[in-house]
Amino acid sequence: MSNGIVIIGSGFAARQLVKNIRKQDASIPLTLIAADSMDEYNKPDLSHVISQGQRADDLTRQTAGEFAEQFNLRLFPHTWVTDIDAEAHVVKSQNNQWQYDKLVLATGASAFVPPVPGRELMLTLNSQQEYRACETQLRDARRVLIIGGGLIGSELAMDFCRAGKMVTLIDNAASILASLMPPEVSSRLQHRLTEMGVHLLLKSQLQGLEKTDSGILATLDRQRCIEVDAVIAATGLRPETALARRAGLTINRGVCVDSYLQTSNADIYALGDCAEINGQVLPFLQPIQLSAMVLAKNLLGNNTPLKLPAMLVKIKTPELPLHLAGETQRQDLRWQINTERQGMVARGVDDADQLRAFVVSEDRMKEAFGLLKTLSM
């Protein structure tokens, strides 16, 4: 490979791929291009920065320069890729272009911001860069409104509450974590958030935001209003597919790839939050780690299909942490819930009494690995 591998992106997926490639090949040319600084940070830490009093710069684990030196890379930070000429094997920015033999899209996903009047007043916490832009406002805010009661929204609500702020969480579902599990399973965490002082406005919808002299006025449905100092959108992520679309690749929710992480173009691959693997978008660390291991082999000619095992998803709510696995969102499961002082074990079984999903909390999270072994896939 005279031109080597070009990777667009510098997040967790890109870094895992670089590390796995370098374990097998120390000299193949590797080029990374990204719009950010390319400094390394741990993205899940963003759910806890406020209670821990961390600034954006405190999150940096390794600078871009250190990364380049350690892994023998060419890095192009603060660079927006504008186009991909798949036929000519060329990646283009406004001022530069790079030839590639193999190209990897690791462009991640962007936070979805609800399209309501005043949406420009909403903050997002999907990157170190986004936190840097709003850290002063968030640190100074006394009253915080979080839009979305999913995984990130629940983590942020608890963190801001632990930092002593008045927190309101709004979601149009009837319970928190509604896309991940039924209400009878999420109720333990929901009750804990309420106990801590989080004001939950469920079955509610944001209509608009307006700047006032004393803060931000949020208008909700049923003619309700609330004034706050900061509004955070935690309403899910959308895979970044614009570049792939311009390159003529097949797109669905994400960039469509097969079990080899290969797109509809034989020399272009996708990895991480932007990828849709055989119809599934999996924006969690473990599938990204496993995908990066497989993709490194495939890029170097050792074709290996990705086989994902049953995997844990961790909800980092320190006052009541949860681990879950399996098809927790399935509507046809029968849930067997055992609750004790030290925690909860909820088992979701199908009509044949096969374990299809589980959720464990607190001290009973240690039972997760045993349950994983009995999970039917």
Curated annotation (Swiss-Prot):
Entry's Gene Ontology cellular component terms: cytoplasm
Principal EC category: oxidoreductase
Entries under InterPro entries matching the protein: FAD-bd_OxRdtase, FAD/NAD-bd_sf, FAD/NAD-binding_dom, NO_rdtase_NorW, Rbx-bd
Name this protein carries in UniProt: Nitric oxide reductase FlRd-NAD(+) reductase
Main location: cytoplasm
Tree of life domain: Bacteria
Keyword Nuclease: no
GO MF, one example: oxidoreductase activity, acting on iron-sulfur proteins as donors, NAD or NADP as acceptor
Gene expressing this chain: norW
Reaction(s) the record says it catalyses: 2 reduced [nitric oxide reductase rubredoxin domain] + NAD(+) + H(+) = 2 oxidized [nitric oxide reductase rubredoxin domain] + NADH
Key words, A-Z: Cytoplasm, FAD, Flavoprotein, NAD, Oxidoreductase
